[in-house]
Amino acid sequence: MTAARAGALGSVLCVLTGASRGFGRTLAHELCPRVLPGSTLLLVSRTEEALKGLAEELGHEFPGVRVRWAAADLSTTEGVSATVRAARELQAGTAHRLLIINNAGSIGDVSKMFVDFSAPEEVTEYMKFNVSSPLCLTASLLKTFPRRPDLQRLVVNVSSLAALQPYKSWVLYCSGKAARDMMFRVLAEEEDDVRVLSYAPGPLDTDMHEVACTQTADPELRRAIMDRKEKGNMVDIRVSANKMLDLLEADAYKSGDHIDFYD
């Protein structure tokens, strides 16, 4: 983080899902220095204690940023509604940017192959959290903070190479990520004032990666994932978070584009 970038994103109202750990937690820390004092960050996750702790950390380190949190299960209608209510109570105020970061997501059951998924309920539950939730949350937030001349609206979908490339035993994860990418491409086509970015952060050393290492059913893929970690070929999570924020600052991407860390 250089001095030249401090406050570069301006006055922002940001809603960040999946904020309590992993990439979301890192994004929260890296975003705060890039916004102007008086900006607001709404942290969303299922885990109340982790959110409280993160909010306290950020409040101490960045006293000029107003940090709020909402503990919500985004796989439910109630959780989405609670998040929208929390955002509405903040109001946009003097913010010149609305930034919605859809980071919450899960890898699903990677211990099974395609032919093992015979229960529709399991697939439906996965898609509720990973596809339906970001669609309904983003739609509701865009309605809550409608188009106005002095407000730039940005939507980020935290994506994956799995949105573009099939991986054996990752049928839920690949399908969910592909659906999300297309969903947000449609948003970019429909709303010409909304800047939309699907960003794939690369292989990160997170809890999700640990699940992939230990539970992936396909032995070749599992070995490749483990080898990458053992050889130190993971992406630094802070570097990836800052690349995403650099992309938002530069604002040079085509709305709806999928951009990978390695691009």
Swiss-Prot record:
Positions binding substrate in this chain are S160, L161, Y173, G202, D260
Record keywords, A-Z: Cytoplasm, NADP, Oxidoreductase
Localization terms from the record: Cytoplasm
Q: What does this protein do?
A: Catalyzes the final one or two reductions in tetra-hydrobiopterin biosynthesis to form 5,6,7,8-tetrahydrobiopterin.
Reactions accelerated catalytically: L-erythro-7,8-dihydrobiopterin + NADP(+) = L-sepiapterin + NADPH + H(+); (6R)-L-erythro-5,6,7,8-tetrahydrobiopterin + 2 NADP(+) = 6-pyruvoyl-5,6,7,8-tetrahydropterin + 2 NADPH + 2 H(+)
For this chain, one GO molecular function annotation is: sepiapterin reductase (NADP+) activity
| Family matches, as PANTHER family | SEPIAPTERIN REDUCTASE
Q: Which residues bind NADP(+)?
A: 18-24, 46-47, 73-74, 177, 204-209
Please tell me where this protein is predominantly located: cytoplasm
Q: Name one GO cellular component term.
A: cytoplasm
Q: Which family does it belong to?
A: Belongs to the sepiapterin reductase family.
Q: Which domain of life is it from?
A: Eukaryota
State what protein this is by name.
Sepiapterin reductase
| Subunit structure of this chain's protein | Homodimer.
Xref: Gene3D superfamilies: NAD(P)-binding Rossmann-like Domain
